[in-house]
């Protein structure tokens, strides 16, 4: 294991941010993530904000695991700052069975490999778990390496 990240989101506060006029919150998600959150909300008869909050917790967890992996390798340079992290290019999408998966856009994946000095024979692997209960959404992400 190279890195571990965890995040907790207050769903009510997150929903309020989503509803604010001019909010940037919706730009943090890809169209595919928004479609999946909407579909899941309609199936589960709950709010779309709940599912987006869980995806947001997972995205934060992914970035935290990435940063921990850098620290573990003695790397102090960060590929992105808080202001320029390409959040919508780090997707949390459900597979055919409904399990969450991390899908990075090609340029983000390249940056991940570059920042961690990944060799051609290795491949970064993400594991993510999402949960929500009441007004709290939570996620854990683990970054591993397949040799």
Swiss-Prot record:
GO terms, biological process: fatty acid biosynthetic process
GO molecular function: holo-[acyl-carrier-protein] synthase activity; magnesium ion binding
Keywords on record: Cytoplasm, Fatty acid biosynthesis, Fatty acid metabolism, Lipid biosynthesis, Lipid metabolism, Magnesium, Metal-binding, Transferase
InterPro entries listed in its UniProt record: 4-PPantetheinyl_Trfase_dom, 4-PPantetheinyl_Trfase_dom_sf, ACPS, Ppantetheine-prot_Trfase_dom
Cofactor needs: Mg(2+)
Cysteines engaged in disulfide bonds, as pairs: none
Enzyme Commission number, as recorded: 2.7.8.7
Major place of residence: cytoplasm
Locations listed in the record: Cytoplasm
Binding site for Mg(2+): 7, 60
Catalytic activity from the UniProt record: apo-[ACP] + CoA = holo-[ACP] + adenosine 3',5'-bisphosphate + H(+)
Purpose: Transfers the 4'-phosphopantetheine moiety from coenzyme A to a Ser of acyl-carrier-protein.
Protein name listed in UniProt: Holo-[acyl-carrier-protein] synthase
Species, as recorded: Bifidobacterium animalis subsp. lactis (strain AD011)
Lineage of origin: Bacteria, Bacillati, Actinomycetota, Actinomycetes, Bifidobacteriales
């Amino acid at each position: 294991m190279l890195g571990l990240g965890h995040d907790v989101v207050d769903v009510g506060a997150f929903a309020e941010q989503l509803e604010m006029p001019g909010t940037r919150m919706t730009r943090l998600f890809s169209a595919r993530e928004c479609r999946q959150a909407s579909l899941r909300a309609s199936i589960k008869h709950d709010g779309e904000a709940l599912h987006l909050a869980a995806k947001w917790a997972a995205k934060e967890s992914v970035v935290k695991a990435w940063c921990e992996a850098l620290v573990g390798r003695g790397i102090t340079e960060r590929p992105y700052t808080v202001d320029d992290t390409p959040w919508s290019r780090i997707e949390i999408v459900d597979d055919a069975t409904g399990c969450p998966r991390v899908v990075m856009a090609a340029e983000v994946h390249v940056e991940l490999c570059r920042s961690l000095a990944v060799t051609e024979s290795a491949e970064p692997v993400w594991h993510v778990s999402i949960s929500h209960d009441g007004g709290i959404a939570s996620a854990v992400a683990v970054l591993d390496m397949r040799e």
